[in-house]
Curated annotation (Swiss-Prot):
The C-terminus inhibits activity; it has to move for the enzyme to be active. Activated by lipid-binding, which occurs via the C-terminus; detergents also activate the enzyme. Specifically activated by palmitic acid; 12 (lauric) and 14-carbon (myristic) fatty acids as well as unsaturated 16 and 18-carbon fatty acids also activate the enzyme. Lipid affinity is increased in the presence of pyruvate plus the thiamine pyrophosphate cofactor. Induction: Activity is maximal in late exponential and early stationary phase (at protein level). Expression increases at pH 6.0. Under control of rpoS (at protein level). Transcribed at lower levels during anaerobic growth. Has 4 domains; the Pyr domain which binds the pyrimidine moiety of the thiamine pyrophosphate cofactor, the FAD-binding domain, the PP-binding domain which binds the pyrophosphate portion of thiamine pyrophosphate and the C-terminal membrane binding region, which includes the in vitro-derived alpha-peptide (residues 550-572). The C-terminus is held closely against the rest of the protein and covers the active site; during activation it detaches from the rest of the protein and folds into an amphipathic helix upon membrane binding. This is Pyruvate dehydrogenase [ubiquinone]. Residues 183-334 are annotated as: FAD-binding domain. FAD binds at residues 210, 234-235, 251-254, 274-278, 292, 297, 311-312, 403-404. It catalyses: a ubiquinone + pyruvate + H2O = a ubiquinol + acetate + CO2. It comes from Escherichia coli (strain K12). Residues 1-182 are annotated as: Pyr domain. Activated by limited proteolytic digestion in vitro. This cleavage produces a peptide (alpha-peptide) and mimics the activation of enzyme by phospholipids. Protease activation and lipid-activation are mutually exclusive. Proteolytic cleavage results in the loss of the high affinity lipid-binding site of the enzyme; the cleaved protein is no longer activated by lipids or detergents. The proteolytically cleaved enzyme does not represent a functional cleavage in vivo. One of its GO terms (molecular function) is ubiquinone binding. The gene is poxB. Disruption phenotype: Not essential it can be deleted. It is an enzyme of class 1 (oxidoreductase). Binds 1 FAD per subunit. Binds 1 Mg(2+) ion per subunit; Mn(2+) is also functional. The Me2+-thiamine diphosphate complex is the true cofactor.
Amino acid sequence: MKQTVAAYIAKTLESAGVKRIWGVTGDSLNGLSDSLNRMGTIEWMSTRHEEVAAFAAGAEAQLSGELAVCAGSCGPGNLHLINGLFDCHRNHVPVLAIAAHIPSSEIGSGYFQETHPQELFRECSHYCELVSSPEQIPQVLAIAMRKAVLNRGVSVVVLPGDVALKPAPEGATMHWYHAPQPVVTPEEEELRKLAQLLRYSSNIALMCGSGCAGAHKELVEFAGKIKAPIVHALRGKEHVEYDNPYDVGMTGLIGFSSGFHTMMNADTLVLLGTQFPYRAFYPTDAKIIQIDINPASIGAHSKVDMALVGDIKSTLRALLPLVEEKADRKFLDKALEDYRDARKGLDDLAKPSEKAIHPQYLAQQISHFAADDAIFTCDVGTPTVWAARYLKMNGKRRLLGSFNHGSMANAMPQALGAQATEPERQVVAMCGDGGFSMLMGDFLSVVQMKLPVKIVVFNNSVLGFVAMEMKAGGYLTDGTELHDTNFARIAEACGITGIRVEKASEVDEALQRAFSIDGPVLVDVVVAKEELAIPPQIKLEQAKGFSLYMLRAIISGRGDEVIELAKTNWLR
């Protein structure tokens, strides 16, 4: 019996080290499903929704650094992959999506479930190609895999179900050679120019992102040599924050006042491996130097006075011998003092209260009780705020989220991918009640896959971050209310340990119990509804917006909201 196209794909993926494929099966994927069953070396991870499959594959790729795979059946099946694939692509992780298609003879006829996948996936992939004949598959699959790995993003192979069942070309090899990522270092002449510029610069600040992964030692040495405070972006937190005497916190909408003021007061700002997008948080008068492995990132969000293309570790390693050590610490010491004040202010907000459970306190205790090498995932919205401000990184912990794409409902799906990839490590999903309930169907996948993830729901019965933005704009928070749900009872009904927490005095015991259980657990914590995530700088328009919101709330007979807002944030 001749090898089918589907079998060729399965064996090629096996040779590339792929261990699992995430997806929802369907008739257009029958060829692939059958080949995987016969082969027995790649596990099919059956989710309830394809979006979850894409998020899970993205988390796997982010943790392993290797190619991860997801699949969707024709039409609606692979359409459901798109949001998760956008997140993978914008996170720069290598993911291959197999998008099954309708019978090849029916393409263009308006057939049942027909879509145009090549157009639909174009914006969330480096490569998207239709396999219309078996002869194409060796080249198309190899190119797709190579582009996903080397370009760090998504590739999509569109495969009609009938083509998958046809014989593969004779003599097609399934050998996969893993090409290593190139190490890019700027020319020495460019490095000397940068060293000279830094020599005559004062009040230097560093802004660091996820491109600093693996460069912690070089980064700290560089900052120490030029006496520069280090500000980090959210995606840089896990790589930069720990064991760092020069760290002064984050900047941005959910950052620290110390990080914000350090950047704004800098005369020279060095951007290292970051695509920080918020123009309002860049200084207007400073010289800006940018170093990034991706030339397309240069000058994308701010003006740039000097730019070098290179990976951060090798570039700093080559730059360090050329840089003259500075003696003046005034700017650095002021930034560190501001950071200590900002950190104390944030820690003061994370104290237990008899009136309500503050989410800051919950996040702080999660960090305290979690394993030293825990993997955290956090939903977009207020859980990301609390994770950014209160989780302590140590070089072993990881933090995953939808930090570039900003999609709701990412935390639980990413936790599935993380736990499957790292079965011996503790995985903690910090979910909002809005995000968790959006893709709650895959809570059943936790049971089915027997994945011991720990899910903590920040249950405030509101789309918290959206409501806060509406208040800042002066709007009433219509449409943000969520039904008060007991998620612990839902967990128990699904066969998972559920723990309900309604008092701050119960938090520690609940977390300790959850983290000690050898299996999945959901901790449903009722947190303060009107908690504000104060940005590092309050603009006049925001202050006016809050005043207008409070006036409108009182006029509309919703004065109780204003009272609760005051009690939660100012009358503790």
